[in-house]
């Protein structure tokens, strides 16, 4: 274990917690921090050392990882003289796994202490991907920094070098842009089929074996069928990502109406069911308005239990 770099890990939520556990299982010495005592207890039970703060976690790390819900959380953790960024030692590497603003990551890299490297590495693949090491990680950074990060991140899933610092977040947000559009569209497609006499199981099978197939069809539709709508990701976080996507879209000199429409229907779902409601309530809104049921019998194991 002495040959392994010392890992600091801040943010042990739905995604960060399983990622931290995978690094522990791979043999890395991990120091962890989270404001949630239960999350900390799970990490320490698996062998992590408990840090007293995010800054304390950063101070002894060779590689420091953050996995936080929103950019403002990253700013709270990293910024200022007492923040984690200032405590990173020369030669260390900060890997931000948060879906973040490109400009924020670039600004923190410019402020980093001498000899500290930074990469952005937001992830996709949901909670089950985090648990099973089947995430996709989009990394932005220099070639040497990517190589160093990849040696650790490969224990979490497929690692893709997207280009210079910040491009990891651009790619992640593009993938989410497509997910939001498709998540909204699948509810409309199911509603059209049901309202015109097609049985839901037949419709789902047909879509999976057609040009309409997608990750959403295979991975997320069962959460609709089960009726829990996947509470591992909230409408509030969907809208946060959609706002970040719209910031990127300001650089596109064309109208992008599908993204605008997706943001609108997610906002409508949040206004009706609450910001904390599960992400696929964007489909429940269609069910409720159309008086249709999209329940389908089956052994639908929730993604966070897979």
Regions found by a protein language model. Give the residues of each.
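NAD(P)+-binding Rossmann beta1-loop-alpha1 motif at the extreme N-terminus of oxidoreductases
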Residues: 1-67, 92, 97-98, 127, ...
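Rossmann-fold dinucleotide-binding core
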Residues: 7, 100-180
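Rossmann-fold NAD(P) dinucleotide-binding segment
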Residues: 54-117
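Interdomain hinge/lid region at the active-site interface
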Residues: 165, 169, 213-215, 219-281, ...
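NAD(P)-dependent dehydrogenase/reductase Rossmann-like domain
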Residues: 273-306
């Amino acid at each position: 274990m002495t040959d392994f770099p010392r890992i600091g890990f801040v943010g042990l939520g739905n995604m960060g917690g399983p990622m931290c556990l995978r690094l522990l299982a791979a043999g890395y010495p991990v120091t962890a921090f989270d404001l949630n005592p239960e999350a900390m207890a799970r990490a320490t039970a698996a062998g992590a050392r408990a840090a007293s703060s995010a800054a304390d976690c950063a101070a002894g790390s060779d590689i420091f990882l953050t996995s936080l819900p929103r950019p403002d959380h990253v700013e709270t953790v990293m910024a200022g003289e007492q923040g984690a960024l200032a405590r990173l030692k020369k030669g260390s590497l900060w890997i931000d796994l948060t879906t973040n603003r490109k400009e924020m990551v670039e600004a923190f890299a410019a402020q980093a202490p001498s000899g500290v490297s930074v990469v952005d590495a937001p992830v996709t693949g949901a909670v089950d991907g985090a648990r099973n090491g089947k995430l996709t990680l989009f990394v932005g950074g220099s070639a040497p920094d990517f190589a160093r990060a990849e040696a650790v991140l490969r224990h979490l899933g497929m690692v893709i070098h997207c280009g210079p610092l910040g491009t990891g977040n651009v790619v992640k947000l593009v993938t989410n842009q497509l997910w939001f559009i498709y998540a909204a569209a699948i509810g409309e497609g199911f509603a059209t089929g049901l309202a015109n006499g097609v049985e839901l199981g037949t419709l789902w099978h047909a879509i999976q074996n057609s040009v309409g197939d997608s990750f959403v069809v295979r991975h997320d539709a069962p959460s609709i069928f089960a009726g829990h709508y996947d509470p591992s990701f909230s409408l509030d976080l969907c809208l946060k990502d959609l706002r970040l996507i719209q910031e990127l879209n300001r650089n596109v000199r064309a109208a992008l109406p599908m993204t605008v429409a997706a943001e609108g229907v997610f906002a409508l779902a949040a206004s009706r069911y609450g910001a904390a409601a599960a992400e696929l309530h964007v489909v429940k809104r269609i069910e409720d308005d159309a008086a249709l049921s999209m329940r389908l019998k089956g052994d639908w194991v929730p993604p966070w239990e897979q």
